[in-house]
Structure formats: structure tokens, C-alpha cells
Amino acid sequence: MNRIVDDQITLIPYYRNDDISLLWYQDSEVCKQVDNTDQIYNLTKLHKMYDYLTSHGSCYYIQYEGVLVGDVTLQDNSELSIVISKQYQNLQIGRRCVSEMIQLAKEQKMVKVSAQ
């Protein structure tokens, strides 16, 4: 079920969409932000990551003004992760999505949320 963040942002439950999501993870600067490595993702690594995230939490695509621009996950262990493609960073998209994920954590009776 979609989660409406505001009039610009909707969180859409994860589904395989390699054509778009692989592009985010083939940007070495984004990978540095996410994993602290310059290693970009290949399709196998992307699938392993999403398979893990979807089986251990709530994973969503971030749709901004009708365009998929990243993903955000709240894991069962209360860890939050977020990726936003470079051209959509610094628009406060992440801040708004994190607020929505904190709300989701409250709904799931999580006491705290952490991010690395």
C-alpha cells in the first residue's frame, strides 16, 4: 500500500524495477554515500540487496512529482536506510521520507530508529 508523504512525495512498496533502480546504484558517488565504497552495483548485487531488505523490513521506492528517485527502508531491527539519486538530492526529499518512516516505526511499535 502506498504511503503519501505530501503532495510531492509518495512511497511505493518495492517491486523489481531494475531499469531505474540500477542506475542509482551505478553512480559511484551515491554508492560512497550509501556503503562508503566506490564500488558500484551490478544486477546481482542489486537483487541481493533488495531481496534482503524486503525480507527484513518495509522497503519503498520514493516517487517525487511522479518520478522514482530513490528508495527508503525501515528494517525489522529498526534501522533506516535511504538512497536518493544525485540529481534529486538537496530538495529535502530525504528529510520528508525519514519523517514518514519514523511514523511507520511508531505504527509498528518500534521504540527507536537508527541510521548508519
Question: Where are each of the predicted segments found?
Answer:
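Residue-level preference for hydrophobic side chains embedded in well-ordered alpha helices
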Residues: 21-22, 80, 97
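Short aromatic/hydrophobic contact patches that present stacked aromatics
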Residues: 10, 79-83, 114-116
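Acetyl-CoA-dependent GNAT
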Residues: 36-87
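A short, well-structured alpha-helix characteristic of acyl/acetyltransferase catalytic modules
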Residues: 1-51
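Conserved GNAT acetyl-CoA-binding A-motif
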Residues: 105-116
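Conserved acetyl-CoA-binding loop-helix of GNAT-fold acetyltransferases
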Residues: 90-105
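Short, well-ordered coil/turn elements that cap or connect secondary structure elements
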Residues: 6, 54-55, 107-108
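Short, solvent-exposed beta-strand edge segments and adjacent coil->beta transition regions
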Residues: 6, 77-79, 110-112
